[in-house]
Amino acid sequence: MANWDHPTSKVRSTVLGLPEQVRACLFDLDGVLTDTASVHAKAWQTMFDTYLYQRAKHTGENFVPFDPTADYRQYVDGKKREDGVRSFLGSRGITLPEGSADNSGDVETIYGLGNRKDDLFRQVLKEHGIEVFDGSRRYLEAITYAGLGVAVVSSSTNTRDVLKITGLDRFVQQQVDGITLREEHIAGKPAPDSYLRGAQLLDVAPDAAAVFEDALSGVQAGLSGHFGFVVGINRTGRVDQAEELRRIGANVVVTDLAELL
């Protein structure tokens, strides 16, 4: 562990695992700072399987369940809810009306299914709480002490609540979340727009900011936004996932942010 008595650019680059020019860090939330990616995957699985099962009964088609690993990672991870619903259903050749953001969860529209998933996610959070990765908390403490800007950039509409419940809000200077994306009409990941907005709020150029992501769509956003550094987080430790994160744009891949300290 480094001596933090006099944080400098050299300390930032050598101890925080970042290039010297980086002045701000933009973090995804689920799977990067908090152990909520598995909760999201379970909520997506429950919502989609219920819908697909009922659809199969009605149409006579075979019921093929949602894969909480492969389908989650390929179609919904890191994306706005409506984009995730649209992407996965499209992979099954299913088209639904768009509906509107105020559709209740029992309405079979793109927004309705997305809201049903959000209801399930909130229920799990209420019953089981939220865990913060210890290495992520330590890394946030270190970069805060070093004077780097911190923003959370997430597609989740629950971001503010999660940050407050976990106490991570004390590290975060700015946030761009699912509510921001909807209100400001910002394109979701893999478009870089949400991360570009985060950098703008911290008043730094993209090439002076690092992006921290576990989702393929988020790493793609970091690459296409021309950010100074992209850190891929591979919680599974699987070699193929690490290689995929590198292939699509991660400069470095770690299993835990503490590896950068």
Swiss-Prot record:
Pfam families: Hydrolase. It is an enzyme of class 5 (isomerase). Beta-D-glucose 6-phosphate binds at D30, G78, R81, S156, N158. It comes from the Bacteria. Gene3D superfamilies: HAD superfamily/HAD-like, Putative phosphatase, domain 2. Binds 1 magnesium ion per subunit. Autophosphorylated. SUPFAM superfamilies: HAD-like. Mg(2+) binds at D28, D30, D214. The modification 4-aspartylphosphate is found at D28. One of its GO terms (molecular function) is metal ion binding. Coiled coil: none annotated. Its cofactor is Mg(2+). It catalyses: beta-D-glucose 1-phosphate = beta-D-glucose 6-phosphate. Its EC number is 5.4.2.6. The keyword Hydrolase does not apply. Keywords: Carbohydrate metabolism, Isomerase, Magnesium, Metal-binding, Phosphoprotein. The active site is at D28 (nucleophile), D30 (proton donor/acceptor). Belongs to the HAD-like hydrolase superfamily. CbbY/CbbZ/Gph/YieH family. Monomer. Catalyzes the interconversion of D-glucose 1-phosphate (G1P) and D-glucose 6-phosphate (G6P), forming beta-D-glucose 1,6-(bis)phosphate (beta-G16P) as an intermediate. This is Beta-phosphoglucomutase. It comes from Mycobacterium leprae (strain TN).
